[in-house]
Every structure is written in C-alpha cells, then in structure tokens.
Amino acid sequence: MADSFNKLTFSLWSKPDIEIFYSLPEEVNEDTKVLFVIHGASRTAESYFTKWYEYTNNKNIILIAPKFDKAAFPSYNSLVVDKKLAQGKGCEYEYSGYCLEPQNNPSNSLSDSISLIFDYFRSKFDIQENSYRIYGHSGGSQFVHRYLLFGQDARAEKAVMANAGWYTFLKDINYPYGVKDMPISEDRLKWFLSVKGAIMLGDEDTDPNDGSLRNDKGAKEQGNNRFQR
C-alpha cells in the first residue's frame, strides 16, 4: 500500500451512501494513527482532504474525510441526517425534533456514524490502533462536539473544533442548543470532559451579518458572532 489519494462509497448502514476520501501510509502497522476530517457547510470534503494531505503525506497516518452530501444529509451538523425526519420510536425527547439514538432511529441518527466508518477501516486495512483523532471546521466543528457528547463510541483520543457558528452547551435547554432530557449518561459526560480537545477561533470573525451565520433566537443568545459564541 502506498500513501495516495483514494475514494470509496460507504454503504454499510441504513443511512444514505456517502463518499469517503482517504489516504494510506506505505505500511499500516501497530503505530499507524487515524485522523478524521469533517467538512463544513460547503460540503467540500475533497478540498479539506487535499489540504490536510499536505501535512499527513509521508507520515504514518490514515487520513479519512467523509462527505455528508447536502441533498442527502441536510442536518448533519446536528447529528441527524435530516431533522425533518428525526423523530423515532422510543425517544422520550421527540419534542425537540431530534432522535439521536441509532437503535431507535437507525436511518437518521448520525451518533454511530464515525464509529461505523472507523470499524470498517479497521477491518479493511487491519488497523491495530483502537482510537482516532478528529478535526471539524465550521459545520464540521458542530458535528464533532455533538458527536463527542452523544456518539456511540468513546474512542476519540483528541479532537479539534474550529470556527463553529453555534454550539450545544451543557445547559438545561432544548437540543440542539442544550442537553435538556437528552440521552447523555453520567459516564458519557465524564468521558466527554476528559477528551483532549481544542477550540479554534478567528479573532476577527466578528461579523454579525455573515451570510453563513445562524441567527435564530437560540444562536443569538450565545453571542452576536462566531467569536463571541
């Protein structure tokens, strides 16, 4: 195996198929690390992959960049395929319009997505490492911190969240702005707070009229711009 640009279609779940861009080192061994890169609202997974490949090329890293297509995954940043279809059976918090538990809503929940992709790559390429690192930008940053909160695995070793437009806080308010009545256990919360993570912000990202900035009531309560939030 050589370090190179690769693409596959992932379909081993009940959600819509996705394209995954990835690269492999010369040899996959016990020291090989795995890095996920989650795109923003532009959905340009290939360009994110290309930029990161400049840094991972010739290193013992498997770089993985899934693409959550806008037509098929309009609400990926909130950890569901489509919030209009998010209600599922057995969810006590359906009033929020979201059902994040895959056992109750397997075709729409993304809280098992990274885990399933990681397991697939581990099996396909005989990866011995059982943890991964993950980076998300903008909408991808929203996806990452929500995945850390509600995901179905605890294998993220490190996480970087860059320039999210708004956040889910550990507050007693409705999801996706808070965690009121959401399925997060005490053990999961302890793990979430123990993950080595970094939040990246641009100190000049202060335009309250940015066309890509969410400006509903819940978002505005977090601040007037990305930097404040």
PLM regions with names:
Residues 39-43:
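Active-site glycine-rich loops that stabilize anionic/oxyanionic intermediates
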Residues 157-229:
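The feature captures the conserved acid-bearing segment of alpha/beta-hydrolase catalytic domains
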Residues 1-34, 44-47, 55-62, 86, ...:
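A domain-start/cap signature at the N-terminus of enzymes
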Residues 77-98, 130:
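Short acidic, low-complexity segments enriched in Ser/Thr/Gly/Pro
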Residues 22, 113-130:
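Conserved acidic catalytic loop of the alpha/beta-hydrolase fold
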Residues 45-52, 68, 211:
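The serine-hydrolase catalytic nucleophile loop
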Residues 56, 118, 122, 147-148:
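A conserved amphipathic alpha-helix that caps or lines the catalytic cleft of carbohydrate-
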Residues 59-76:
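Conserved alpha/beta-hydrolase
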